Every structure is written in structure tokens, then in C-alpha cells.
Regions:
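N-terminal, intrinsically disordered, polar/charged segments of Gram-positive cell-envelope systems
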Residues: 24-86
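Catalytic His-Asp segment of secreted/periplasmic serine-dependent ester chemistry enzymes
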Residues: 206-289
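Sec-exported extracytoplasmic/periplasmic mature domains
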Residues: 99, 103, 154, 166, ...
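Positively charged n-region of N-terminal signal peptides that target proteins for export
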Residues: 1-7
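Conserved SGNH/GDSL esterase-like catalytic core that processes O-acyl groups on lipids
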Residues: 81-179
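Charged helix-capping and loop-helix junction motifs
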Residues: 176-185, 223
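Active-site segments of SGNH/GDSL-like serine hydrolases
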Residues: 164-168, 190-224
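C-terminal motif of bacterial Sec signal peptides marking the signal peptidase cleavage site
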Residues: 18-21
């Protein structure tokens, strides 16, 4: 098991390294790939930083801890399908693609992610998840009924809630408001299922050639800024953070071509090779019980 701790006073010095790309476009989805991709995110603290960290109290260090060698903020272990029996995955069209990927594997007789459920919808965001349900809203459906996330969570009562949102937030709302909306929505979900573990996954990158200089357009600089802020938010709130974004980056910091299914379009959606990596990551980084 790997575990590394770093505290808030060093956070600002390592975030650019922690959220940098892994520089891979290989399509194999082995544990070795995930290990290599995550190890490239490590950095060493200077003697001056160490001196500063020693001045922190143990309580502050634990509150601000984040793994330096690992892309997650908790003690982790390899898990099997049963671990996900009480899990629900929430997300936008990228996660909807993952739902289709898992559903196809299950239809072919594979046991994938146990009995995990999905609440996904195209264009879903932290922001619009707070809106009232209507014909125009993009809330996901559960048992055939469109409903707010917290209402679906109240019915499912999951023990683990995995969230991948932000792609449809950051360009529209900015980083600060996105974090505020995330705080509101996650609080509502926890009221609906007290005791559930929250796992926030970092927003995944955009294919660099698809980026635009137009004001208000989604770009990787804003995505990276959101991920740093979301990481800090998760640590402060006691939520689990999973930094999956670097697994899919190329040397430019954008979504690697082999992992992008819409290079001529939005440049944000995944190929099956990317979903292979994501699935393997989930099994490799279960939370130590």
C-alpha cells in the first residue's frame, strides 16, 4: 500500500506537478499504466518546506493531508466487484459514456463494478443540478423518472457516491461558484443518504487542438484551476478526492488523442481505451476500510 502525506503549506508549491499530464497515449489498461501515470505526479519537498511543515500541529496536518505519491487523498487498496455494490456514479455525458461502457460489459456476461448504479445525463453540472426539474432540465432519471440528484440518492441510499462533474460548470460559472454549487449539491445528497462516502473525481481534460481562445470557451487552464480548488475543497470538507485527470493527458496537458472520441467536435469525450484506464483505476484505488 502506498501512502504519502503533504500538508496545506506545501500544496501551492506542488499543485502544478500534482495536476500535470502523464504524457501517455497507450491504449492498454493495466495496473502498471496506472502506477506509472500516478508516479510521474510526485515531487519532493525542499528542506525549507520540511521546516515549515514541522511547525504544523498534528491535527492540522491530518486535516490538510493529501497523498504525494498517490492520486487519492485516502489510504487505498485493490478491491473487487463487491466493493461497488453500494456505489452510485454521478456525472455528465462523459460519465454517461462510462455507464454505456459498463452496461455493455455486463450484457456480455462480465461482472463489472458489482451492483453499482448510475445517475448520469448529458450536460449535467453542479449548477444545473440545483435547478427545478422540468421538461427542459437535464436531471438524470432513476427508475424511469427524471428527478433531482438528492431525490434519487434518497431512494438508492448508497454507501459510496462517486462524482465526476465540472466540464459543464467551469466555463459558465467560474471556479469559485462551481465550488459553491458543489458544496450545496453534495450537502443535499448527504442529507438524503447520511454516512455515505463522497468520492470527487477531478474534471478530465479537453483535447488541446479543440481548445478555443473565445471568451467563455472551455479550456484546460480553467479545468486545471478547478481541479486544484476542488482538491482543496474536498480535503477541507473531509471528502475523498481522486485525481484521475492526469491519466488521460498528453504532453500538452490536454486529452490524449488516443483517449478522445470526438477530436473534430467538442474534444472532451472518451474512447473505450480511456474507459479501460478509468475502470482499472477504480479497482486499484478502493478506500481502505
Amino acid at each position: 500500500m502506498k501512502r504519502g502525506l503533504i500538508i496545506v503549506c506545501a500544496c501551492l508549491l506542488i499543485v502544478s506537478s500534482f495536476f500535470s499530464g502523464c504524457g501517455t497515449s497507450d491504449t492498454q489498461s493495466t495496473t502498471e499504466e496506472v502506477t506509472q501515470a500516478t508516479e510521474e505526479q510526485t515531487t519532493e519537498a525542499t528542506s525549507e518546506e520540511v521546516t515549515e511543515t514541522q511547525e504544523e500541529t498534528t491535527e492540522e496536518a491530518e486535516k490538510a493531508s493529501v497523498s504525494e505519491e498517490s492520486p487519492v487523498t485516502y489510504e487505498y487498496t485493490q478491491v473487487d466487484d463487491s466493493y461497488f455494490n453500494d456505489a452510485v456514479f454521478i456525472g455528465d455525458s462523459i460519465s454517461y459514456g462510462f455507464e454505456l461502457y459498463v452496461t455493455e460489459k455486463r450484457a456480455n456476461g462480465e461482472t463489472v463494478l458489482g451492483e453499482a448504479k448510475f445517475l448520469t445525463s448529458g450536460s449535467l453540472s453542479y449548477g444545473n443540478s440545483l435547478w427545478d426539474v422540468s421538461d427542459e432540465s437535464v436531471h438524470p432519471t432513476y427508475n424511469g423518472v427524471k428527478m433531482k440528484l438528492e431525490d434519487a440518492i434518497a431512494q438508492i441510499k448508497p454507501g459510496k457516491i462517486y462524482i465526476l462533474l465540472g466540464t459543464n460548470d467551469v466555463a459558465l460559472y467560474g471556479v469559485e461558484q462551481t465550488i459553491a454549487n458543489a458544496d450545496t449539491e453534495i450537502s443535499r445528497m448527504l442529507e438524503a443518504s447520511p454516512g455515505a462516502e463522497i468520492f470527487i473525481m477531478s474534471t478530465t481534460p479537453k483535447y488541446s487542438p479543440a481548445e478555443s481562445d473565445v471568451d467563455g470557451a472551455l479550456n484546460n487552464a480553467d479545468i486545471d484551476a478547478l481541479n486544484v480548488a476542488m482538491w482543496q475543497f474536498a480535503v477541507e470538507k473531509g471528502y475523498n478526492f481522486m485525481n484521475i485527470a492526469p491519466l488521460f493527458k498528453d504532453e500538452t496537458g490536454g486529452l490524449a488523442a488516443d483517449y478522445c472520441s470526438d477530436k473534430e467536435g467538442m474534444g472532451i469525450h472518451f474512447t473505450s481505451a480511456a474507459y479501460d484506464i478509468w475502470l482499472n483505476f477504480l479497482y486499484s484505488y478502493g478506500k481502505q476500510q
